[in-house]
Design a protein with these regions (language model features):
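C-terminal partner/receptor-binding element of secreted or periplasmic proteins
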Residues: 138-159
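C-terminal segment of N-terminal export signals and the immediately downstream linker at the start
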Residues: 25-48, 110, 117, 159
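Hydrophobic core segments of beta-strands in well-ordered, beta-rich domains
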Residues: 76-77, 126-129
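N-terminal secretory signal peptides
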Residues: 32-78, 83
Length: 159
């Protein structure tokens, strides 16, 4: 009798603890990454001018002398006009998902994007690790963005 009572009591305790045990891995193992994919020199988007994708329609290297710091990252620009555009509305020009590859993000991975492989969709900039990511994006951008966003929302960021 005592043995059965202990077993039942243990079973009840396990049943009460199980939801906490199931939820714990998402808290304990949450990924922490830099909000922006930074180059070895600390520049966002590998030092490319993020406003130039919109103003010039091209991936353009920024100049060391023209920088803006936003959300802890240093952003380079090719000209003063692009720097001013970014300063006025950085969220309109910053790459989505912090400059990480959109395709990789949709697959729950964090891989830096290549600023030479990019798309603008619905007025937002998306970068990819390789041209294949852009090709997949072209086949279903909204679906890929939704998948990437759902993963992005689970991440925590080093500020």
């Amino acid at each position: 009798m005592i043995k059965n009572a202990l077993s039942r009591r243990s079973f009840v305790r396990l049943g009460l603890a199980l939801p906490a045990l199931v939820a714990a891995p998402s808290v304990v193992f949450a990924k922490t990454i830099s909000r922006f994919s930074l180059s070895k020199t600390g520049h966002a988007l590998d030092g490319y001018d993020t406003a130039a994708y919109f103003s010039a329609g091209a991936a353009t290297n920024g100049a060391d002398a023209l920088t803006v710091t936003w959300k802890g990252a240093v952003w380079r620009f090719a000209n003063e006009e692009d720097a001013a555009l970014f300063q006025a509305n950085p969220e309109a020009y910053a790459p989505q998902f912090g400059g990480y590859c959109t395709r990789a993000m949709s697959l729950k991975k964090e891989i830096p994007g290549d600023p030479e492989v990019w798309r603008i969709h619905d007025g937002k900039l998306y970068v990819f690790f390789a041209s294949r990511g852009g090709t997949f994006f072209d086949k279903g951008p909204d679906e890929m963005i939704a998948l990437a966003q759902s993963h992005w929302d689970t991440l925590t960021f080093v500020e």
